[in-house]
Curated annotation (Swiss-Prot):
Gene3D superfamilies: 3.30.70.270, 3.40.1170.60, 5' to 3' exonuclease, C-terminal subdomain, DNA polymerase, Y-family, little finger domain. GO terms for molecular function: damaged DNA binding; DNA-directed DNA polymerase activity; magnesium ion binding. Mg(2+) binds at D18, D116. It comes from Streptococcus thermophilus (strain ATCC BAA-250 / LMG 18311). Keywords: Cytoplasm, DNA damage, DNA repair, DNA replication, DNA-binding, DNA-directed DNA polymerase, Magnesium, Metal-binding, Mutator protein, Nucleotidyltransferase, Transferase. This is DNA polymerase IV. The gene is dinB. The lineage of its organism: Bacteria, Bacillati, Bacillota, Bacilli, Lactobacillales.
Amino acid sequence: MLEFPLINDTSRKIIHIDMDAFFAQVEMRDDPSLKDKPVIIGNDPRKTGGRGVVSTCNYEARKYGVHSAMSSKEAYERCPNAVFISGNYSHYREVGMQIREIFKCYTDLVEPMSIDEAYLDVTTNKLGIKSAVKVAKLIQYDIWQELHLTCSAGVSYNKFIAKLASDFQKPAGLTVVLPEEAQEFLKKLPIAKFHGVGKKSVERLHDMDIYTGADLLKISEITLIDRFGRFGFDLFRKARGISNSPVKPNRVRKSIGSERTYGKLLYNEDDIKAELTKNAKRVAESAQKAKKVGRIIVIKVRYSDFSTLTKRMTLDKSTQDFDTIDRISHSIFDQLEENSSGVRLLGVTLTGLEDQEGRQLDLDNLA
């Protein structure tokens, strides 16, 4: 078997900025009466007959076990005193662009991963600041002073560890992992916290008695590749803190979609939803093959009179999981106004795409 040298570039200074419960935080900033209340971004199930899904929620709501992609009905059952807000996504995008302008004051090497998070390479920066920690603190300060929003920051020598670090002390946290500290940091981390390891994969790793980074470190590269395919190669390196992926500004935003036109109009709701599921499956399979994950799910419905409706849902975390795409596509469809005319076309699209590296995915799809 070919073996490649483990080249680890520790000279870079990478920051990962992740806004804290961004959509909910913007709503709380704009409406001070929401302070200290559980806030859920999603349709109120009391107004939709139980339909709807949670886009995100604030930390107060998370205390009740509410999380993104949960049905609004279950969220209400867990937290009946929550304030449900349908969400103003165009406003969130505007605020997201304001945040990016702050990033650009420090470096042009900014790689947005979504509307509320980005990687920054500040190895060399516009202000000539040698300390990446100081840059991260200044960015946190600027975002608070200008926008009255908090973010968490991770600072390290690569994107993988910087992302893990930004999740370590939320909200409004700053975690620094130096090259000489990376191995101990990763050893203590539960394997489920490694970005790129989905729930099913965690189960498979647990079956191998791999529960932490320290456990993963003991497994040979050959064993990991044999069990997980190409991704085993990446796991072996990440366990050692090796990830030389560059910060890529101006990343091309693409979408993955599937739509079908029906010669025979669809009238029956069961038939329509069965076709939605087929589209969702094709999208998930295409995303997994392309090694992409997305945060926005869009459905498109064209009726017999050629009128067309599109509706989208933005998730708190990116996905390529079929069950998630299927469930949310159905939830979005349920929110459309009833139309008795037949359906001529159905489409499902996953957009807001990014590379699966550093994100949640299912290793079963890579074996």
